[in-house]
A protein has these predicted regions:
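N-proximal low-complexity "stem/linker" segments adjacent to membrane-targeting elements
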Residues: 4-74
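The conserved acidic donor/metal-binding loop of glycosyltransferases
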Residues: 140-143
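Residues that form or flank phosphate/diphosphate-binding pockets in enzymes
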Residues: 64-65, 93-94, 122
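Glycine-rich, basic loop-to-helix element that forms the pyrophosphate-binding segment
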Residues: 114-131
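Short alpha-helix within the catalytic core of nucleotide-sugar-dependent glycosyltransferases
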Residues: 67-71, 96, 125, 133
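Acidic donor-binding segment of Leloir-type glycosyltransferases
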Residues: 70-116
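Short aromatic/hydrophobic "clamp" motif used to bind/position activated sugar donors
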Residues: 136
Length: 143
């Protein structure tokens, strides 16, 4: 920066670290845990096992995204969690059915219908109202 100034420094920095330079698939292949490692994680018992409340506001979430999000939480190796979902459009029958089936299959999944979409902050607060955890995590419905 001393030799080129802030503008040239920024240009050189951004040219050097482009998102295209990061091959996520390659990185994931090199860092993906083995089945044995995942089982070891599941079998690990901690002295303190806090309940993690994961808050997710949903509103007309595409079916595949919603299913993948729920499945990704269910596959966590740490089992002391609850998924608190605030459904801001209960009239969407597809979303409502996915949530009903998921919460029936796994009691850690709690669904609260929000009568009217009040935006992400208020919908998240609706999910928070059903949370019982020691810690809170936030997750987007399409993650």
């Amino acid at each position: 920066m001393k030799h080129f100034g802030p503008k040239e420094f920024w240009i050189r920095l951004t040219e050097r670290f482009q998102a295209d330079d990061v091959d996520y698939e390659e990185w994931y292949k090199n860092h993906k845990p083995t089945m044995e490692e995942l089982q070891r994680q599941r079998d690990t018992e901690f002295e303190y096992e806090p309940l993690i409340s994961i808050l997710v506001p949903v509103y007309n979430t595409p079916e595949e995204f919603l299913k993948q999000m729920i499945q990704s939480v269910r596959k966590q190796t740490y089992g002391k969690w609850e998924l608190c979902i605030a459904n801001a459009n209960p009239a969407n029958e597809t979303v409502a059915e996915i949530l009903r089936i998921s919460s029936t299959k796994d009691e850690r999944i709690k669904v609260k219908d929000v009568p009217e979409n009040e935006g992400i902050a208020q919908n998240t607060n609706a999910a928070l109202a059903s949370a019982m955890g020691d810690y809170i995590g936030l997750l987007d419905h399409d993650d």
